[in-house]
Curated annotation (Swiss-Prot):
Site keyed Transition state stabilizer: positions: H178, R239
Species assigned in the record: Vibrio vulnificus (strain YJ016)
Gene name of this polypeptide: ackA1
Its biological purpose: Catalyzes the formation of acetyl phosphate from acetate and ATP. Can also catalyze the reverse reaction.
Protein name: Acetate kinase 1
Major localization class: cytoplasm
């Protein structure tokens, strides 16, 4: 039986897709539709070479999925005819979903109910699920939740020091994101160290335009930096991460900012973009560090925040840390950021191997600390699509 899984990741203005063989991990197709709802909506894909096409003025998720089915997959019948199931990345599953789920009307309703916790993402996921069901009515659909891996966090880690009824009645707590990536890295470290997953203790840094840290104890998430939403925690591309909540009142009451303006500023105009006042692109920050004041400022704040989180999470692991790991677009490719962060953690006996660190870029992986380092640090490429494909195959009975 075929184990080809169509993996869909619908963002607020994008649709990422791939066809993955859940049995051997081979990726037969990958692509991205971006700038959806805008005049420049376009789609790029890799299938027997690289391709790109315009989707038309204001094209939405439905049009992008239709193009993928009717144009891209139609050009490769051996793929479309052998698709066995569809897996969907879903950002927020709240407390209702502690693991991946076969999509039923009840599960779809649950995803809709969680939309208040991820208003930019969950509605887009629902559109993608319904469009996929329409395009492939015979295939089973599976939801794989970013929040599920973090449902093992203890109460002391996920509760906020707010009136307890806000949690009991409204579910206001830490949920965390990037769970699928953190899970994949945990499994990879177990394999590299030749240990059962249940014995792995790591601190994983998933660094991209969105970024989070996760403390993993005995193979389970015990703390993570993102909170109720993906806004909390690290400095990100355009998101502020941790701030004094009273800043919001000051912006509103003293400076006259509207709630909408504050929300836009914290989510789309802060982070690296806010600190540089130029760009959210980490490559600019890295290339101009020490030369341009704005780049130096942004990189120092980014690395300070990340090192502080990593150091703090050692306390949750109670004495044993097998590895510090870096993944995601920045984590996998930015040798300077990795070195700056690890050098700030010298108190733990960490020694960076600068040559190995420099080699571990652009698909390179491996240990980036010296043999004398008390704690190893590793670069590992994440593969969320594979985790989604594997869970989908399992739940779809492939």
């Amino acid at each position: 039986m075929s184990k080809l899984v169509l993996v869909l990741n619908c963002g607020s203005s994008s649709l990422k897709f791939a066809v993955v063989d859940a049995e051997n991990g081979a990726e037969h197709l990958s692509g991205l539709a971006e700038c959806l709802h805008l005049p420049e909506a376009r789609i790029k894909w890799k299938l027997d070479g690289k391709h790109e096409a315009q989707l038309g003025n204001g094209a939405a998720h439905e049009e992008a999925l239709a193009f993928m089915v009717e144009t891209i997959l139609a050009s490769k019948p051996e793929l479309s005819e052998n698709l066995a199931a569809i897996g969907h990345r879903v950002v927020h599953g709240g407390e209702q979903f502690t693991q991946s789920a076969l999509i039923t009307d009840e599960v779809l309703k649950g995803i809709e109910d969680c939309a208040t916790l991820a208003p930019l993402h969950n509605p887009a996921h629902i559109i993608g699920i319904k469009a996929a069901q329409k395009s492939f009515p015979a295939l089973k659909n599976v939801a794989v939740f970013d929040t599920a891996f973090h449902q093992t966090m203890p109460e002391e880690a996920y509760l906020y020091a707010l009136p307890y009824n806000l949690y009991k009645e409204h579910g206001i707590r830490r949920y965390g994101m990037h769970g699928t990536s953190h899970l994949f890295i945990t499994r990879e470290v177990a394999s590299l160290l030749n240990k059962p997953v249940e014995e792995v203790n790591i601190i994983n840094c998933h660094l991209g335009n969105g970024a989070s840290v996760c403390a993993v104890k005995n193979g389970q998430s015990v703390d993570t930096s993102m909170g109720l939403t993906p806004l909390e925690g690290l400095v990100m591309g355009t998101r502020c991460g941790d701030i004094d909540p009273a800043i919001i009142f000051h912006l509103h009451d003293t400076l006259g900012y509207s709630v909408e303006k504050i929300n836009t500023m914290l989510t789309k105009e802060s982070g690296l973009a806010g600190l540089t006042e130029v760009t959210s692109d980490c490559r600019f920050v890295e290339d101009n560090y020490g030369q341009k004041e704005e780049a130096t400022r942004a990189m120092d704040v980014f690395c300070h925040r990340l090192a502080k989180y990593v150091a703090g999470y050692t306390a949750t692991l109670e004495g044993r840390l097998d590895a510090i790991t870096f993944t995601g677009g920045i984590g996998e490719n930015s040798a300077p950021i990795r070195e700056m962060v690890l050098n700030r953690l010298g108190i733990f006996g960490i020694e960076v191997d600068s040559e190995a660190n420099l080699k571990a870029r652009f698909g390179g992986e491996g240990v980036i600390t010296t043999a004398n380092s008390r704690i190893p640090a590793m670069v590992i490429s994440t593969n969320e699509e594979l985790v989604i494909a594997e869970d989908t195959a399992r739940l779809a009975g492939l």
